[in-house]
């Protein structure tokens, strides 16, 4: 009988069947497995709405929507946009892109994510770590980057591959790999990335035009020293403006932590800094006839006035670089997912609900694929913007939609006003976010709990700081693996 039972056992499902089942389970989740059987006997409109609710979870949250929730979401979305617009532009410059690409990335990915994701809090946009990782890894490619258009093609293609990997992770249930990525490695990586981001922003803070593209400590210090020796390479006005408004932003943040009633001031401080510094730069540069004679380095003309342009034709699959771009896309996909899921879980727990990791991963992947086709670069969950959204009283993902539409309006009507925005102020805004990436308490906890993990953390930190982002990650992951053997 036992042999007969084995012989009559059903064949395992095919790979295609497993993929189809995974897609259904990820995109059409439902707590009651009998629900869809029940809906078969219901009118078509009811079945269609149930399907749409599962495909687009935001519809379920809108069933009990009211005027009070709309008011909260409108205020949170506008507050979020005021905070996000300068940050999006600053992160774009960190990725060595024009500021408008940061604004593009603050429109399409958040709108798509708001419709598809199970999270009610995560705010999507360009992140500082992703921007640094993207620019530093593309700069290591041994292919000629003739001009900015070639670089942009590489950026969009990497974003496309990152989205493909993220969707695959979600559909094939590989989300657990991201969740179990060593926390020690991530802590060390983020701390070193924060130092790298800070060092790179010295370029904008001092108004230096010619600066080393590498992110390791030795290269950046050497570039700074060369610029300082050449007095004409920088102007003290840039440092004065950048440092003054950096202190202002940090001071408002301090006030917000001390007094919750003043939290709003820290949210609007970046935009106030952009407005104030732009007025100062306009006054200082007013009498100069040519941009090269400006004493304060400014952004100059920013392309705007329209929706995100299509970038499908800018994807490149050249056999010389496509393998390298796939590798970069995989690395960035994992790093951005790790941060996004951590942010989502943290804020979901504060509101007493959970998120579906695999659905989040698929949603992030879809938005990055679509983003790569609409002039966006890699987008992920932002801790600082999610915190602003939470503290501003957001009720649903409608606040994210309000933010994205506000960014769109600013791109369409206000880009001309950003001409005199100092580069130093964008550097100051990014620098103000750097301390949040360095978690000394977590590093201390890792040291107390597991010395081997702390060595992996240290290896990742030193590797990123003195070599490159990619080498640092490899050292952190491999050292932890070998130390555990």
Curated annotation (Swiss-Prot):
Compartments it resides in: Membrane
GO molecular function terms attached to this record: secondary active sulfate transmembrane transporter activity
Keyword Repeat: no
GO biological process: nodulation
One Pfam family named in its UniProt record: Sulfate_transp
InterPro entries listed in its UniProt record: S04_transporter_CS (IPR018045), SLC26A/SulP_dom (IPR011547), SLC26A/SulP_fam (IPR001902)
Membrane topology field: Multi-pass membrane protein
Spans traversing the lipid bilayer: 74-94, 97-117, 121-141, 152-172, 186-206, 232-252, 262-282, 321-341, 361-381, 400-420, 421-441, 455-475
Cysteine disulfide links: none
GO cellular component terms listed in the entry, alphabetical order: plasma membrane
Keywords annotated in UniProt: Membrane, Nodulation, Transmembrane, Transmembrane helix, Transport
Family the entry assigns: Belongs to the SLC26A/SulP transporter (TC 2.A.53) family.
Function: Possible sulfate transporter.
Name this polypeptide is given: Early nodulin-70
Native species: Glycine max
């Amino acid at each position: 009988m036992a042999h007969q039972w084995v012989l009559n056992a059903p064949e395992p499902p095919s790979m295609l069947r497993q993929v189809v089942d995974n897609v259904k389970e990820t995109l059409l989740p439902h707590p009651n497995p009998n629900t869809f059987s029940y809906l078969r006997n219901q009118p078509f409109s009811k079945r269609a709405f149930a399907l749409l609710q599962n495909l687009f979870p935001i519809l379920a949250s809108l069933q009990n929507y009211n005027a009070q929730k709309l008011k909260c979401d409108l205020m949170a979305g506008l507050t979020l946009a005021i905070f996000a617009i300068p940050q999006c532009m600053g992160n774009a410059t960190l990725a060595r892109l024009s500021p408008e690409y940061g604004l593009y990335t603050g429109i399409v990915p958040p709108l798509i994510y708001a419709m598809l994701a199970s999270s009610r809090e995560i705010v999507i946009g360009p992140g500082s770590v992703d921007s640094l990782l993207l620019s530093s890894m593309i700069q290591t490619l041994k292919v000629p980057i003739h001009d900015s258009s070639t670089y942009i093609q590489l950026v969009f293609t990497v974003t496309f591959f990152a989205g493909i990997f993220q969707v695959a992770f979600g559909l094939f249930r590989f989300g657990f790999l991201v969740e179990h990525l060593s926390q020690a490695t991530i802590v060390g990586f983020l701390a070193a990335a924060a130092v790298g981001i800070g060092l790179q922003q010295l370029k904008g803070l001092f108004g230096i035009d010619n600066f080393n593209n590498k992110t390791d400590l030795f290269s950046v210090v050497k570039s700074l020293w060369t610029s300082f020796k050449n007095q004409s390479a920088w102007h003290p006005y840039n440092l004065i403006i950048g440092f003054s408004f950096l202190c202002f932003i940090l001071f408002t943040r301090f006030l917000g932590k001390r007094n919750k009633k003043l939290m709003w001031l820290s949210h609007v401080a970046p935009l106030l800094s952009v407005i104030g510094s732009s007025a100062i730069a306009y006054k200082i540069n007013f009498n100069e006839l040519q941009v090269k004679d400006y004493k304060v380095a400014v952004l100059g003309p920013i392309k705007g006035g329209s929706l995100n342009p299509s970038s499908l034709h800018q994807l490149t699959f050249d056999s010389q670089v496509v393998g390298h771009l796939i590798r970069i896309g995989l690395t960035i996909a994992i790093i951005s997912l790790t941060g996004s899921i951590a942010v989502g879980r943290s804020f979901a727990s504060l509101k007493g609900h959970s998120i579906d990791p695999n659905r989040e991963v698929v949603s992030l992947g879809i938005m990055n694929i679509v983003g790569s086709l609409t002039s966006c670069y890699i987008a992920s969950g932002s801790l600082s913007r999610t915190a602003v959204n939470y503290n501003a009283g957001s009720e649903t993902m409608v606040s994210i939609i309000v933010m994205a539409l506000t960014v769109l309006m600013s791109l369409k009507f206000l880009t001309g006003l950003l001409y005199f925005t100092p580069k130093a102020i964008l550097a100051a805004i990014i620098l103000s976010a750097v301390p949040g990436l360095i978690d000394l308490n977590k590093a201390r906890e890792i040291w107390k709990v597991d010395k081997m993990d702390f060595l992996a953390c240290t290896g990742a930190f030193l590797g990123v700081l003195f070599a490159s982002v990619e080498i640092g990650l490899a050292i952190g992951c491999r050292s932890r693996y070998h130390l555990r053997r």
